[in-house]
Every structure is written in structure tokens, then in C-alpha cells.
């Protein structure tokens, strides 16, 4: 659940960045949230958090290649409940993607010698995803629990059998 929520919210930020230059939250072509819709939502603060991630994409002028590597790193930041068959192989894979992100940042023509700072900003952005995703999962769990509490169960004797 955590990995799925992480990827979904990161992808939402990317779509918002690409389709609306982060002016709106772009869930889907027919579901775009402006500030007013965010306010009407029960998850206004979470929408603001997702919007902030998208605004960071604009500020950093994130490339698709950086986004893709960061997405993989988000996946690799979650260890399965059952553990790993090979912790060493997992760490090696994660380290390789971190190195790849560092290479990508170094090759970026817009950096002009500030690659270490950009790398720091990108990894800081990844770190900020974890708090947001934890809050999103908590909201989903709370909403699920509330919906379960509102379920009405009727005694079996009230059930009407269909006429045959």
C-alpha cells in the first residue's frame, strides 16, 4: 500500500507539472483540482502537500529522466513486510540508482557546477514524499474505518426473499 501510494502521488505531481505547469492538481483529464476544489475536498491539507511536490518540480525544472530514476528510488525505499531474500542485492540495486541519479544531475546542462546542490534538492524532495504518503495512508485508513462504522446491518428476519 505504501509503495502504491508513493508512486501514485509522485505520478500525480508529475502529471500536474507536465499538463498544468503545477497550477492545478491533475488527477485525470476530467478530474483537475484548482484551489477552490481543493478547499471543498475533505483532504485539503493533503492536496496542498501534493501540490507543493508539484511546485518543487517546477522550481527544479525536473527532467523526465530524473523523475523516472526518482520513481524507482521511491520504490526501493520500501522494504517488503516479509523482508528480502537478499539484502545485499537490494542495497546494491538502490546504490546503483542513487549513482545513476547523481550522474544524471552531473550531465544536466543547466547546472553550471551546482550538481551537488541539485542532487541534494532532489533527494530532499524524495524525503518529503514519505511524510506526505504517511499522511495520505492515514487519511485513507481513517476514511475506510468511518465508512465501516456507518454500515447498517439488518437482522436476517428482515430480509425479503424474492418471489419465485
Curated annotation (Swiss-Prot):
Phosphorylated. It holds the Pfam family Hormone_recep. Coiled coil: none annotated. One of its GO terms (biological process) is nuclear receptor-mediated steroid hormone signaling pathway. It comes from the Eukaryota. One of its GO terms (molecular function) is estrogen response element binding. Residues 1-162 form the NR LBD domain. PROSITE patterns: NR_LBD. Its main location: cytoplasm. Keywords: Cytoplasm, DNA-binding, Endoplasmic reticulum, Lipid-binding, Membrane, Nucleus, Phosphoprotein, Receptor, Steroid-binding, Transcription, Transcription regulation. The keyword Magnesium does not apply. Progesterone binds at residues 15, 143. InterPro entries: NHR-like_dom_sf, Nucl_hrmn_rcpt_lig-bd, Nuclear_hormone_rcpt_NR3. 21-hydroxyprogesterone binds at residues 15, 143. Aldosterone binds at residues 15, 143. It is a peripheral membrane protein. It is found in: Cytoplasm; Nucleus; Endoplasmic reticulum membrane. One of its GO terms (cellular component) is endoplasmic reticulum membrane. Belongs to the nuclear hormone receptor family. NR3 subfamily. Composed of three domains: a modulating N-terminal domain, a DNA-binding domain and a C-terminal ligand-binding domain. Heteromultimeric cytoplasmic complex with HSP90, HSP70, and FKBP4, in the absence of ligand. After ligand binding, it translocates to the nucleus and binds to DNA as a homodimer and as a heterodimer with NR3C1. Binds the coactivator NCOA2. May interact with HSD11B2 in the absence of ligand. Binds the coactivators NCOA1, TIF1 and NRIP1. PANTHER family: KNIRPS-RELATED PROTEIN-RELATED. Receptor for both mineralocorticoids (MC) such as aldosterone and glucocorticoids (GC) such as corticosterone or cortisol. Binds to mineralocorticoid response elements (MRE) and transactivates target genes. The effect of MC is to increase ion and water transport and thus raise extracellular fluid volume and blood pressure and lower potassium levels. This is Mineralocorticoid receptor. It comes from Sus scrofa (Pig).
Amino acid at each position: 500500500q505504501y509503495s502504491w501510494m508513493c508512486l501514485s502521488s509522485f505520478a500525480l505531481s508529475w502529471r500536474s507539472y507536465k499538463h498544468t505547469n503545477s497550477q492545478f492538481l491533475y488527477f485525470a483529464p476530467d478530474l483537475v483540482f484548482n484551489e477552490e476544489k481543493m478547499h471543498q475536498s475533505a483532504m485539503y491539507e493533503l492536496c496542498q502537500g501534493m501540490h507543493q511536490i508539484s511546485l518543487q518540480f517546477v522550481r527544479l525544472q525536473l527532467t523526465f529522466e530524473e523523475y523516472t530514476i526518482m520513481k524507482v528510488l521511491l520504490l526501493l525505499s520500501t522494504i517488503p513486510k516479509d523482508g528480502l531474500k537478499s539484502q545485499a542485492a537490494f542495497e546494491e540495486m538502490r546504490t546503483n540508482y542513487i549513482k545513476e541519479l547523481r550522474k544524471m544531475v552531473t550531465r544536466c546542462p543547466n547546472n553550471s557546477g551546482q550538481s551537488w546542490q541539485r542532487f541534494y534538492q532532489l533527494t530532499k524532495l524524495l524525503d518529503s514524499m514519505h511524510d506526505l504518503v504517511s499522511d495520505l495512508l492515514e487519511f485513507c485508513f481513517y476514511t475506510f474505518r468511518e465508512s465501516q462504522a456507518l454500515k447498517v446491518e439488518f437482522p436476517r428476519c428482515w430480509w425479503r426473499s424474492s418471489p419465485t
